[in-house]
Amino acid sequence: MATLMRDLKDMEAAAQIQGFRLIGHSDLNGYGDAMQVVKRGNYAYVAHVGVSPLRLSILDVSDPADPKVVKQFEHLPNTHNHKVQIVGNTLIQNSEKSHWGQVTDYP
């Protein structure tokens, strides 16, 4: 817990230096390989770069100070899905062949 608090303080300090203010944080259940975030209403859709087994995380951000992971989806073997868009009521996500080969030993 002490390490997490130190990391959050470091992030907050870095954000303030750049003119931003940290409002909330999610570690995405330990899968921090986020590549793109799209917000629609009270939800944030996070595309993962493909280092973890995840392709998409959905967070409830109705309370920005305390975002909550609602659902996470795994990518197919040998693929990554690092982009996400929302058009109307449709979520669109890419599915690309991984260029780095099959990863079988996720942390």
Regions found by a protein language model. Give the residues of each.
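Feature marking well-ordered beta-strand scaffolds used for ligand recognition
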Residues: M1-P107
